[in-house]
């Protein structure tokens, strides 16, 4: 039977090759050499692209820097909802590059795609800024505007991601491949410069400027929006200087159809009646031209190498989550400068700005002079190893922190701290329901202690009997407690005798390097205490206890206090990182109020500087892996599919974020053990990647052109040539 003839069931085994598809590609017209920057190999158009990328990254990272706080304090979402939406937005930003690449390669081309999606990007910033104006509607409207804005921003930033880097690479002639390689380093430099500056500036716009009596989120979102407008204007200004390769048809659809046809054709002919073919994609030769099949082969070869890569991003992206939470339990006082926990991640773009020229101009050149073939894939493998080491160091730091962290009571346990506000020493005996002794402790008057005693209960809730011996007096008080809580027993004067009150304590270190304070008012007048931006704390008279209030670390020499008829000042002194304080207001003097200061939970002692080694390692890993990966993706992509491959590279970042969410949600491990788990997983992935890369044969510029005129070389497996020994890891 003729293989090109329909059978009785009207199923087509093979489709005839159209005359148009069999024709060779028309020769390209001679290219005009674009103007260069100061006689270098860099086209002038590159300057517009790099400035555009700097402004766009400033816009993105600046908005993202204050996004979580916006969710928490403006929309009043809880931490779980805020975290979920934040990571969902981040993942969406790395999934949409597939759409942008498809539009660029099959419809509009890279230039128009960048222009149009940048307009969508700007519109998203407009919605986001409007959603941060307090007087504009209620919470529902703010939420809708915010989610619409974030969706448009994700579409805009994700859609242009694969296009901008590849469009910059298009500006170079083939003979300037070395300059193109350096361009990707400059491009990555612009990304991190924008990230570094915006991460410093936008939190200042939010916190230091007040809008409608609160933090100015509208300004913090509006300024990044203006930077995106500037990015669009700068990019459009270079329009006449750009080389604009036209789109080469519906590439994504062609690739999918080609792969599908090859698989179906191979499956239909699995009986072996027809001769075997050198590669499974060769089964598409009856319908698709050889140059397309060769391009798809080159694409799948690189995509196969991409399979292990998400694990690297799973580690790298934890700088903004797990590592920040780790910094939250450390002391940010560096002596000459006080560093907040969420500011530590600024170290990454700062080090990138140093490491990129250091690696390009010094380290790589020294390795080259030693005649070591340090290829792109080898750099990426070394980057993975450095990331493994970074997380091993993070695990060591975490174990050190665990030795200093404030413990939490378990089931049928409570922690009890005794504070003596009486004039003399008091002996405290705590008895259980069966009069069994749970605690015997002597406490000096106004003794400053951070000591908590662990008491074992007989049930989840229980009444405890407190026997207080003061001079010759014995006082008995009963208090109810519940398991897994921390309590403070406050002993105070009651005329000639003493009494006690049991106050539930948080027992938890304040988040984000803040200090937590509360007050006990022994005066006979109600007291209002003003702590800067928040509403005054009200403390009732005669041993009234205030709620906790978190404040920034710093000195508070003159806190405003007032009763119904007088105004006073109160010196709180230095409030330190992660410390919980109790202030007992004892009396009024001519200088103001006097208070006794006690630390419930001690200061974070481990310096945040101990995170420096892990940041150095992970940043070096990023430079070797990410910068190299950008250039590798471009150089190994067929000319018709460069944006598609760039989008696939970014897609590995999205998958990496999902890995973090899954492991963090279901591992149930201690934090140090989770760090070790990630380190070991990446080490295994690195070994697999190294084996895959050993057999990888790099794509040469003439490979796909030659494929249209001669037989496709023998390649086996998943596009890994097992016959050649000309390997390049």
UniProtKB/Swiss-Prot annotation:
Extracellular side, ranges: 79-87, 135-139, 205-217, 317-343, 402-611, 665-674
In-chain residues carrying the UniProt-annotated modification Phosphothreonine: 12
GO biological process: antibacterial innate immune response; dipeptide import across plasma membrane; dipeptide transport; metanephric proximal tubule development; oligopeptide transport; peptidoglycan transport; protein transport; regulation of nucleotide-binding domain, leucine rich repeat containing receptor signaling pathway
UniProt subcellular location: Apical cell membrane; Cytoplasmic vesicle, Phagosome membrane; Cell membrane
Transmembrane regions: 58-78, 88-108, 114-134, 140-160, 184-204, 218-238, 296-316, 344-364, 381-401, 612-632, 644-664, 675-695
Keyword field contains Cell membrane: yes
GO cellular component, one term: phagocytic vesicle membrane
Glycosylation sites: 435, 448, 528, 587
Transmembrane helix in keyword set: yes
Cytoplasmic compartment residues: 1-57, 109-113, 161-183, 239-295, 365-380, 633-643, 696-729
Catalytic activity: a dipeptide(out) + 2 H(+)(out) = a dipeptide(in) + 2 H(+)(in); glycyl-L-leucine(out) + 2 H(+)(out) = glycyl-L-leucine(in) + 2 H(+)(in); glycyl-L-lysine(out) + 2 H(+)(out) = glycyl-L-lysine(in) + 2 H(+)(in); glycyl-L-glutamate(out) + 3 H(+)(out) = glycyl-L-glutamate(in) + 3 H(+)(in)
Region (Disordered): 1-35
Protein name according to UniProt: Solute carrier family 15 member 2
Record organism: Rattus norvegicus (Rat)
Species classification: Eukaryota, Metazoa, Chordata, Craniata, Vertebrata
């Amino acid at each position: 039977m003729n293989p090109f003839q329909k059978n009785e069931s009207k199923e087509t085994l093979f489709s005839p090759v159209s005359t148009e598809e069999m024709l060779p590609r028309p020769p390209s017209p001679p290219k005009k050499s674009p103007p260069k920057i100061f006689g270098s190999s860099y086209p002038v158009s590159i300057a517009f692209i790099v400035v555009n990328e700097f402004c766009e990254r400033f816009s993105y990272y600046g908005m993202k820097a204050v996004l979580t706080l916006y969710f928490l304090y403006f929309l009043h979402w809880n931490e779980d909802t805020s975290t979920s939406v934040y990571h969902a937005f981040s993942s969406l930003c790395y999934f949409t590059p597939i759409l942008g690449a498809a539009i660029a390669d099959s419809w509009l081309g890279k230039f128009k795609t960048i222009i149009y999606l940048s307009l969508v990007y700007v519109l998203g910033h407009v919605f986001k800024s409007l959603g941060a104006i307090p007087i504009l509607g209620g919470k529902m409207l703010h939420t809708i505007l915010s989610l619409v804005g974030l969706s448009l921003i994700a579409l805009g930033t994700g859609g242009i991601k694969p296009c901008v880097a590849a469009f910059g690479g298009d500006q170079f002639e083939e003979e300037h491949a070395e300059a193109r390689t350096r361009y990707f380093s400059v491009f990555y430099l612009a990304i991190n410069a924008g990230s570094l500056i915006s991460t410093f500036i936008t939190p200042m716009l939010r916190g230091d400027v007040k809008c409608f009596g609160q933090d100015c989120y509208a300004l913090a979102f509006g300024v990044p929006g203006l930077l995106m407008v500037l990015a669009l204007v700068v990019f459009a200004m270079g329009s006449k200087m750009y080389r604009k390769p036209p789109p080469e048809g519906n590439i994504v659809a062609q690739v999918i159809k080609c792969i599908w046809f090859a698989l179906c054709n191979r499956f239909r002919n699995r009986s072996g009646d027809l001769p075997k073919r050198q590669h499974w994609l060769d089964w598409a030769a009856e319908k698709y031209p050889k140059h397309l099949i060769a391009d798809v082969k080159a694409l799948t070869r690189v995509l196969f190498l991409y399979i292990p890569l998400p694990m690297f991003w799973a580690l790298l992206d934890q700088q903004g989550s797990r590592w920040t939470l780790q910094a939250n339990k450390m002391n940010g006082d560096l002596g000459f400068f006080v560093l907040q926990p969420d500011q530590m991640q600024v170290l990454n773009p700062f080090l990138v700005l140093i490491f990129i020229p250091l690696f390009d101009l010094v380290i790589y050149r020294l390795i080259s002079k030693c005649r070591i073939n340090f290829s792109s894939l080898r750099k990426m493998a070394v980057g993975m190893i450095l990331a493994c080491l970074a997380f091993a160091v993070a695990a060591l730091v975490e174990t050190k922190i665990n030795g200093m962290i404030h413990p939490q009571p378990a089931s049928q346990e409570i922690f009890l701290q005794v504070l003596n506000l009486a004039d003399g020493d008091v002996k405290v005996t705590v008895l259980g329901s069966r009069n069994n002794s749970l605690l015997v402790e002597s406490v000096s008057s106004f003794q400053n202690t951070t000591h908590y005693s662990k008491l074992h209960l007989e049930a989840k809730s229980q009444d405890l009997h407190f026997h207080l011996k003061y001079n010759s007096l014995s006082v008995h008080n009963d208090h109810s407690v519940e398991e897994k809580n921390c309590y403070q027993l406050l002993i105070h004067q009651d005329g000639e005798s003493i009494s006690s009150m049991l106050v539930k304590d948080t027992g938890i270190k304040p988040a984000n390097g803040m200090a937590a304070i509360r007050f006990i008012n022994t005066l006979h007048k109600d007291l209002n205490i003003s702590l800067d931006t928040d509403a005054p704390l009200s403390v009732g008279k005669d041993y009234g206890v205030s709620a906790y209030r978190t404040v920034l670390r710093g000195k508070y020499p003159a806190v405003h206090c007032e009763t119904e008829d007088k105004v006073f000042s109160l010196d709180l002194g230095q409030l330190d990182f992660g410390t919980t304080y109790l202030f007992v207001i004892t009396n009024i003097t001519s200088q103001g109020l006097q208070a006794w200061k006690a630390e419930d939970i001690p200061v974070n002692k481990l310096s945040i500087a101990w995170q420096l080694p892990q940041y150095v390692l992970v940043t070096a890993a990023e430079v070797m892996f990410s910068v190299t990966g950008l250039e590798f993706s471009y150089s190994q992509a067929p000319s018709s599919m460069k944006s598609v491959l760039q989008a696939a590279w970014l897609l590995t970042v999205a998958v990496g974020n999902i890995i973090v969410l899954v492991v963090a949600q279901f591992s149930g491990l201690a934090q140090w053990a989770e760090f070790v788990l990630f380190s070991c997983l990446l080490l295994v992935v690195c070994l697999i990647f190294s084996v895959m890369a050993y057999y990888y044969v790099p794509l040469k510029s003439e490979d796909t052109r030659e494929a249209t005129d001669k037989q496709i070389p023998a390649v086996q497996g998943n596009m890994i040539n097992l016959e050649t020994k000309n390997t390049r890891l």
